[in-house]
């Protein structure tokens, strides 16, 4: 099995060598005599050997990205069956045990069809970061490739995708004075006040967050107050200018109205499949204030169980928040220029392009 150290080395080689393939022809054309041209040719050939070595060590990956309810899981399953692959899930909610229906986690029967990784890693009262995901997923990619199978990354958590492919900048530790300041704001004035303060300091960040998303609002305030830099700027900063892996990324592009209707229908299906019972069981063990239980859908179901939301209002709120989330996902992934967007019925085209990519 190829070691992680080798993979890290090949990533470094890959990033060092790629510029030579961009600049090589121009530089060769600038040589003034034959001897210089020979030296230049040898120089480029040597780097080509190193580049080839790095790519042999570093496995190819297929990525299935895009917004919620767009059919990522079904497409990824089809690709895994077609290309002898294993699925590496990239969803920040599917890492939680006991949270299955509301996270649209693949069912046990589906998981038996092809191997799935990065599911059911922690309990709802535990934490899991994008950095930890990147390390764990890298290790799994290495093992899947060693089995001569295709690693297929599937999910809609853009930060996980970016952390794995490009790395993420480490956010400096938050000084206690800033943490106390933000906590004091929240204790004295509440979440809505903090959200309005975030609108002043980080307008773009505030727009992306629900006004009741206490944990993320406070975190965003801590970061911008202590560093002068928004949380999004840290998340979008790429330590690696080029991706750490060779990958081919696809996403399914639906008409917005159609996608929104899929979201609405899926909400009903989840509720009919026992989502209420799932949440009731969670509440026997965990506080409703836990971050995962404040996620889209779970919070609304809890409010319904607490008689704070009638059934119809609960359904509408889940649908609305999910549509808003899908819109944010679309915005995120649209900024990733290396994702190929396809119509839902273009499956044959997707398969053909992946075949070409894998045969290179």
Where are these regions (language model features)?
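Short hydrophobic targeting helices and cationic amphipathic motifs
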Residues: 4, 9, 15, 21, ...
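Residues in and immediately flanking transmembrane alpha helices
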Residues: 12-15, 20, 36, 85, ...
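Polybasic, low-complexity intrinsically disordered segments
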Residues: 21-43
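Phosphate/pyrophosphate-binding catalytic cores of soluble transferases and nucleic-acid-acting enzymes
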Residues: 43-360
């Amino acid at each position: 099995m190829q070691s992680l150290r080798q993979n890290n080395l090949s990533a470094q080689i890959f990033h060092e060598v790629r510029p030579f393939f961009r600049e090589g022809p121009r530089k060769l054309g600038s040589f003034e005599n034959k001897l210089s041209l020979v030296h230049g040719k040898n120089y480029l050939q040597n780097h080509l050997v190193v580049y080839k070595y790095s790519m042999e060590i570093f496995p190819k990956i297929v990525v299935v990205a895009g917004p919620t309810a767009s059919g990522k899981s079904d497409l990824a399953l089809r690709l895994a069956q077609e290309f002898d692959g294993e699925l590496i899930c990239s969803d920040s909610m599917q890492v939680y045990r006991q949270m299955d229906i509301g996270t649209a986690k693949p069912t046990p029967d589906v998981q038996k069809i092809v191997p799935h990784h990065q599911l059911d890693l922690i309990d709802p009262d535990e934490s899991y970061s994008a950095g930890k995901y990147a390390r764990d997923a890298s290790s799994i990619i290495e093992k899947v490739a060693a089995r001569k199978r295709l690693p297929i990354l599937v999910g809609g958590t853009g930060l996980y995708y970016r952390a794995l492919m490009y790395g993420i900048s480490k956010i400096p530790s938050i000084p206690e004075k800033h943490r106390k300041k933000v906590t004091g704001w929240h204790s004295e004035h509440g979440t809505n006040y903090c959200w309005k303060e975030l609108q002043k300091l980080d307008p773009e960040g505030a727009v992306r967050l629900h006004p009741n998303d206490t944990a993320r609002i406070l975190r965003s305030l801590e970061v911008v107050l202590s560093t002068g830099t928004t949380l999004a700027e840290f998340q979008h900063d790429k330590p690696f200018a080029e991706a750490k892996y060779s990958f081919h990324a696809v996403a399914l592009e639906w008409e917005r109205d159609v996608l929104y209707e899929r979201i609405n229908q899926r909400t009903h299906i989840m509720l009919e499949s026992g989502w209420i019972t799932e949440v009731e069981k969670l509440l026997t063990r965990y506080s409703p204030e836990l971050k995962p239980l404040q996620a889209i859908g779970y919070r609304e179901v809890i409010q319904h169980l607490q008689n704070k939301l009638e059934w119809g209002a609960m359904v509408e709120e889940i649908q609305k928040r999910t549509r808003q989330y899908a819109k944010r996902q679309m915005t995120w992934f649209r900024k990733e220029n290396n994702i190929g967007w396809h119509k839902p019925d273009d499956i044959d085209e997707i398969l053909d392009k992946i075949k070409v990519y894998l045969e290179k």
